[in-house]
Amino acid sequence: MKPPVRVAITGAAGHVSYSLIFRIAAGHMLGKDQPVILQLLEIPQAMDVLKGVVLELEDCAFPLLHGLVCSDDVHVAFKDADYAILVGARPRGPGMERSDLIQANGPIFTTQGEALSAEANPEVKVLVVGNPANTNALILLKNAPYINPRNITAMMRLDHNRALFQVAKKMGCHCSDVEKMVVWGNHSASQFPDISYAEIAGEKVAKGVENNWHGDNLIPIIQQRGAAVIKARGASSAASAASAAIDHMRNWVLGSGGKWVSMGVYSRGNSYGLDEDIMFSLPVICEDGDWREVAGLELSSFQRAMLEATEAELQAEREAVADII
């Protein structure tokens, strides 16, 4: 059996992590032959709840779980981490604007970036889940000088998975049959779910749907899906977010099998003329523990306008935290 790897998880007593941690311990993320040591971080006032999660983890007797670390100290939780999934973030409170939320999360991700850079494996792979994920990831990146910017990512896989299902539902097929789906930009209502390249069995999806379905149906459904979940269940997406995090990390580590996936990545060197200092969701292919951009796709004027709109939002978010990056 392989030697165990260390997986750090922040916000470990929260709803998303409750759906995430047990799946990682069961081998769903890194494979059935990869033992893990879970390093769980929480704020002091949630440590008692985290103890309950640990009791349940112990009671599962997972063969792949080779150790547990629980702490409210980032330096302890991130020590020698090979993977870090940053779920914890300041939630949006009543009357808070998005800009307020971004600024409130700034100190959290500044501290975590510094600690990861100091304590983690230098090749640590980082996924930021806590919202606003793209700009939180940018803050982290700017405060983690010893981590390769390519190894810091923001989660767009939930949006990607949502789009796969909606396209499959429309086309009467299984979501695993849909290929070359792309979600561009920010994890927000400005994101751009794009079917321009999507295929099912080699046939273009765009040819099989009404001309207005993409703009009038798919795009708003995906952009507002998170709000629809909150309205229906009275809480934000948890199990689906955890599943998306598993998918993101599994493909990044083990490969995406040649398939396109959407990942929020540092935009430096991108082939689409985008601002080179934001965390922007691009189509990528994962192989050999790395990702590469699907470069040079042809863009229509509509696509370009959609990319520019979400790019502008990310630029505004960056400006809101300019003093800490």
UniProtKB/Swiss-Prot annotation:
InterPro entries attached to this UniProt entry: L-lactate/malate_DH, Lactate/malate_DH_C, Lactate/malate_DH_N, Lactate_DH/Glyco_Ohase_4_C, Malate_DH_type2, NAD(P)-bd_dom_sf
Pfam families associated with the record: Ldh_1_C, Ldh_1_N
EC numbers for this chain: 1.1.1.37
Catalytic activity: (S)-malate + NAD(+) = oxaloacetate + NADH + H(+)
Any one GO molecular-function label of the UniProt entry: L-malate dehydrogenase (NAD+) activity
Keyword Transferase: no
SUPFAM superfamilies to which the protein is assigned, alphabetical: LDH C-terminal domain-like (SSF56327), NAD(P)-binding Rossmann-fold domains (SSF51735)
Record carries keyword Iron-sulfur: no
PANTHER family, alphabetized: MALATE DEHYDROGENASE (PTHR23382)
HAMAP family per the UniProt record, alphabetical: Malate_dehydrog_2
Protein name as annotated: Malate dehydrogenase
Organism: Desulfotalea psychrophila (strain LSv54 / DSM 12343)
Lineage: Bacteria, Pseudomonadati, Thermodesulfobacteriota, Desulfobulbia, Desulfobulbales
